[in-house]
Amino acid sequence: MKVAISFIGTNKYLDYLPQYYENIEKYFLPNSEKTILAFTDGELEDTPDNLKVYHQEHLSWPYITLKRFEIINKAREEIKKNDWFVFIDADALPVATITEEEFLDRCCGADTNQVPLFGVHHPCHYLKMPPHLQGTGAYETNEKSEAYFDVSTLPPVYWQGCFWGGKVPSALAMIDELQARVDRDLEKDIVALWHDETQINKYFYEREFDVHTFGPEYAYPEVFDQYC
């Protein structure tokens, strides 16, 4: 199995790359052929053969996160060489082995052709922490936004933007669509409430049967260890 993994690390976030690379190689899909796609404004020398570097200027907040779909698309041709695309935040680390069997497992007898996308249940939503499960939750309520969500009934899952992806054709379709939605919002001077994460949640909710949801134990901060 060939897997492309996206690392966006501009400015000081590039400092996370050495540990990120080491942990990905050691713990994440250990029997797969992995390529790390590093988007950065920093200088990298003597990089491993499976680390591909793409120049990316640092953008002010929140655009460095909001425009991540556009950033990732710079590596489109490299992504196409793989079976799976995975996004993992620069400051997120696998700390225990995630096997191929675990990663590819799907509920209720389904397979990855039927459920080609994946996300992770936000641990703060799981723990019912504010603003989740209160009022309008963490959803965009501006009807003019591409990420607008009818909050009359809040969904049972809110996905965190730190860990998501899918089989390459489905993942690229998602990246293209969300890049277009972000651009249309920006043309109207709209930034969704939680930026790229808000856009991801709208997209996943529209396709909930195409999305496998990993539990919050795949995304929690160390301080949540006793809860997840």
Task: Identify the role of each PLM range.
Residues 15, 19, 71, 79, ...:
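Catalytic phosphate/metal-binding cores of nucleic-acid and nucleotide-processing enzymes, i.e., regions
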Residues 145-228:
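Catalytic core and acceptor-binding pocket of nucleotide-sugar-dependent glycosyltransferases
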Residues 1-67, 74-81:
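N-terminal anchoring/stem segment of glycosyltransferases
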Residues 93-143:
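Conserved donor-nucleotide/metal-binding helix-loop-beta segment in metal-dependent transferases, i.e.
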Residues 56-88, 95-96, 195-205:
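A conserved donor-nucleotide-binding helix/loop in the catalytic core
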Residues 10-12, 42-45, 58-59, 92-94, ...:
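Short, solvent-exposed loop/turn segments at secondary-structure junctions
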Residues 15, 45-47, 94-97, 102-103, ...:
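Short catalytic/ligand-binding loop motif for oxyanion handling, primarily in non-cytosolic enzymes
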Residues 37-38, 86-89, 94, 165, ...:
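A structural signal for short, well-ordered beta-strand segments and their strand-loop junctions
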